[in-house]
Every structure is written in structure tokens, then in C-alpha cells.
Regions:
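C-terminal segment of classical bacterial N-terminal signal peptides
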Residues: 2-9
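Short, flexible coil/linker elements and helix-boundary hinge sites characteristic
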Residues: 5, 113, 342-343
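N-terminal secretory/targeting leader peptides
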Residues: 10-104, 120-343
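Signature of the catalytic double-stranded beta-helix
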Residues: 104-117
């Protein structure tokens, strides 16, 4: 990593950065530790002052505006939160049956030009997208076993809205939108059959093993077929970024990549431990097959296009991803798939 020496004595630049993690969570602890390391790594020239969720900006809308307006210099959100503000952001984190491995997202951002395109889009909003932060997959906990897509028919499932809900509806699911805090009571009362939330570690802490008996995964190696790589990021105020010395800009970019890896690997270790606890509590993992995933993807393709066609920036990002998915190194989408979808 690039560490800067304390050269000429100059006043340190201090950035206030708010995360969407609540204080006391592993996510916030990791974020705080990383922020606190920047002063030393920058030779005292740059200080990141971390804040947990709601500390300065009370909700996501306020957070977005606080960074645009310079009340905060930066934020650490889930990228998907901005789908209503930056339409392209629906393609800046995973979506149903799209690229489903973390390394594929790093490849698209850092090797195939997606980072540059994303920054170009964010600049229109007075923001600078520093880089993606790998996090985890989102998974479904169910009161009933789901051994195939056919088993979804007639189920009432809490899922995020938008593209995810639209694809599940193709398989006869009645989708419900609920805030995280309402999921446990809804499962407990049986008003829903199943619920998506984040990964195993967090879901275990929320008590999901007490109110469900099954965990739905994709084929081996794919924890989730609908939101497998739920990315976070570091986004900063564009003026604050431009005012930073180029060598400090380089440090921040490198440090975001380091932090992405540390955050991801820590969460994965917690997931492995949590799955053992789910098993001990009597939960069973059911897996969809590779054929199920292909069928899910075929249903998703027209929905991808609908979302991409809402906005030219969204389409530019999606076109990059489609080209990558059609490359033989990935092979997720073929010309035949597109023809079948009428594309």
C-alpha cells in the first residue's frame, strides 16, 4: 500500500464520512477501524472522521444530499440505495441472474472501464465514486422447502422491490416489501412464507433460525441467484475530491481496494461460522439447480432490458456487462438467449 511520509508541515484535511452501518455492528467496526488508519497512512495529511448511520444525516435521502452539499465529505452506502436518484445504479451492484461472483464485479470495474464510466455518471450529481466495496450475497429464509423454481409458485416472499420483485413475480411469487425490522415478526406470525435479507451472519443474529426452517441457495458456488454481490462503495463530494492532492487521491483509491477485500473476507468468515449455527438449530439448506438458474436468467433478460432502457447511463453500464456475460470466459448469456427474449 502507498504510505505517504510527513513531508512539508501543512494543515491536515479532515473528511466527515457517514456509513449506513449502525454503531456496534461488525460492518461499522470495520469501517471505523479503516477510517482511523488513514491519518497514519497519509503521514498526517488526511483524516477520515467516521460516523454511523443517522449520526449526521437522518436517512438515505438526507445522506445523499449531505454529501452533494458538502455537509459531509463522504458516504459509505449500499450502491443500490440510489436506484431512484441515479438510474444506472441498478447495474452498479448485482441484479437477478447477472454477474454473480465478486471477482467478476472487480474485473468489470477495474479492468473493463466500468469505474471510469461510473465516475462520469456520478460527476453529473456533484459526486465522485471512489470505488466499490465488496460485501456479501443476500439470501432467502423460508418456512417451506424450495427445491426448484416450481416450488416458488403461490409463495408470499419479502424481497426488495424493483428488478428483483419483477423477476420473482414471473414464477408466481406474491412479493411483499417490508423494512428489515418487520421481517422477523412477519415470519413469526406467518403473514409471509419466506424473506430475503442480507447474508447468513447478520440474518442469524436477527433470529431467523427461530422462525424459518429452510435457507434457499443457488447451485454450488452461488449463494444467491437474485442478489449475489451486494456492493457498497465510497462516494465523496466532487469538490472535496478535486481539492485533494493527487498523491492523496491515489492513496484513497488504493485504500478503498484494500478495505473492500478486508470487509468482504471478514463477512465471509462470519458467514461460515453462522451457517454452522443455522445447522445446529435444525435449519436445512435447499439448492436450486444450474437448470433453475438458467431458467431464472431467461426470465430476467427482458427485465434487464426494461431497466437499462429507462436511462442512457444505465444502458451504457448494462451494455458493458452484457458484453462481458456473453464473452466465453463467462458464458452466462448466448445469442440464443437474447433471441428467445426477443432482443
Amino acid at each position: 500500500a502507498l504510505t505517504l511520509g510527513a513531508g512539508q508541515a501543512q494543515a491536515a484535511t479532515t473528511w466527515k464520512i457517514q456509513s449506513v452501518w449502525d454503531a456496534g455492528t461488525v460492518g461499522y467496526d470495520l469501517f471505523e477501524e479503516w477510517c482511523n488508519s488513514i491519518k497514519e497512512k497519509s503521514g498526517g495529511e488526511l483524516i477520515f472522521r467516521p460516523y454511523p448511520a443517522k449520526a449526521v444525516a437522518a436517512d438515505n435521502n438526507a445522506l445523499f444530499d449531505a454529501v452533494r452539499n458538502g455537509v459531509l465529505q463522504g458516504m459509505n452506502p449500499f450502491t443500490l440505495y440510489w436506484s431512484g436518484k441515479i438510474p444506472a445504479s441498478v447495474f452498479l451492484s448485482s441484479y437477478p441472474a447477472g454477474p454473480d461472483q465478486p471477482h467478476q464485479w472487480d474485473t468489470m470495474f477495474y479492468s473493463l472501464g466500468m469505474l471510469e464510466k461510473t465516475r462520469e455518471i456520478y460527476k453529473k450529481y456533484g459526486l465522485f465514486y471512489v470505488g466499490p466495496i465488496q460485501h456479501d450475497a443476500n439470501i432467502i429464509h423460508s418456512k417451506k422447502p424450495v427445491n426448484s423454481l416450481a416450488d416458488l409458485k403461490g409463495m408470499k416472499i419479502r424481497v426488495p422491490g424493483g428488478m428483483v420483485a419483477e423477476v420473482f413475480q414471473q414464477f408466481g411469487v406474491s412479493t411483499v416489501s417490508l423494512p428489515g425490522s418487520d421481517i422477523f415478526p412477519a415470519l413469526e406470525k406467518g403473514t409471509i412464507d419466506a424473506a430475503d435479507y442480507v447474508g447468513p451472519a447478520v440474518n442469524y443474529e436477527l433470529g431467523f433460525s427461530q422462525v424459518t426452517d429452510y435457507i434457499l441457495f443457488g447451485p454450488p458456488g452461488v449463494m444467491s441467484i437474485y442478489q449475489p454481490v451486494d456492493l457498497m462503495d465510497l462516494t465523496v463530494n466532487l469538490r472535496a475530491w478535486n481539492a485533494l492532492d493527487p498523491k492523496l487521491q491515489q492513496l484513497v483509491e488504493e485504500e478503498v481496494r484494500n478495505y473492500s477485500q478486508k470487509h468482504y473476507l471478514t463477512i465471509q468468515k462470519r458467514n461460515i461460522e453462522a451457517m454452522e449455527k443455522f445447522k445446529a438449530d435444525g435449519d436445512t439448506v435447499t439448492r436450486l439447480s444450474q437448470q433453475d438458474l438458467q431458467e431464472f436468467r431467461r426470465a430476467a433478460i427482458p427485465i434487464w432490458y426494461n431497466w437499462a432502457n429507462k436511462n442512457e447511463d444505465a444502458k451504457a453500464i448494462f451494455d458493458m456487462q452484457l458484453e462481458y456475460m456473453m464473452n466465453d470466459t463467462v458464458g452466462y448469456v448466448t445469442e440464443e438467449d437474447l433471441k428467445a427474449a426477443g432482443k
